[in-house]
Swiss-Prot record:
It comes from Acetivibrio thermocellus (strain ATCC 27405 / DSM 1237 / JCM 9322 / NBRC 103400 / NCIMB 10682 / NRRL B-4536 / VPI 7372) (Clostridium thermocellum). One of its GO terms (cellular component) is plasma membrane. One of its GO terms (molecular function) is cobalamin 5'-phosphate synthase activity. The gene is cobS. Keywords: Cell membrane, Cobalamin biosynthesis, Magnesium, Membrane, Transferase, Transmembrane, Transmembrane helix. Pathway: Cofactor biosynthesis; adenosylcobalamin biosynthesis; adenosylcobalamin from cob(II)yrinate a,c-diamide: step 7/7. It comes from the Bacteria. Its EC number is 2.7.8.26. Belongs to the CobS family. This is Adenosylcobinamide-GDP ribazoletransferase.
Amino acid sequence: MKYLKRILLMVGFLTRIPVPFKIDGTEEDYGKGLVFAPVVGLLIGGILTILFYILKRFFPPGVTGILLIAAYIMLTGGLHLDGLGDTFDGIFSNRSREKMLEIMRDSRIGTNAVLAVICVVILNYALLSSIPLSGLPKALLLFPVAGRIGSLVGAGSTVYAREGEGLGKSFINCCGIKEILQGGIIYFIVSLLVLNIKGLLLAAATMITSFATVKFFAGKVGGATGDILGAVCELNQTFFLILFYLFK
């Protein structure tokens, strides 16, 4: 029951998919529950894959790609894209660490945020539109998993950057190497089942990009925040799609 509870907590927090009943979780439940973030990614990917098979019967590939991107944003509520924008606003402001963190918490949208979100969305659309239709279902199934493993790696491999409370504190303080290993096993198994040896190589590569991305951001502000976890998720999805396209 504990694991089911944590899975449902992750579904409720990381997506806009309705959970049929209210679940109260502790800080530990959220932090340890991030192990199941790849499972949530697989759920998102499964919905997108089913939607793809429906949409392709009625629309050309270009329109289908736009609708799939829109569906992804609706499924996640734009949570990770918001983190991406806030992170780029702060990190690339070229200010002090304290000022960067202050900018990231500011609800106003800056130029760097707009550019980052637009570039990632357009690049994802271009990649999805360029992948052959025969391979697209597998890409759709796995790219959200790659993104969520990025958030897990980010939470488990660094410290919380802020003093006081914040959205990502529970995840970062209660998540560690053990959770990364457990979530990584899920990621590698799913990737192997979907893409065979190629899946293992892509999983290994995107685990590495996760570590590299979070270390870059953490080096700027002294750790990670909820926004940074969202940014790593979105960037890792794009890295996965790039690699999938290159090695299609």
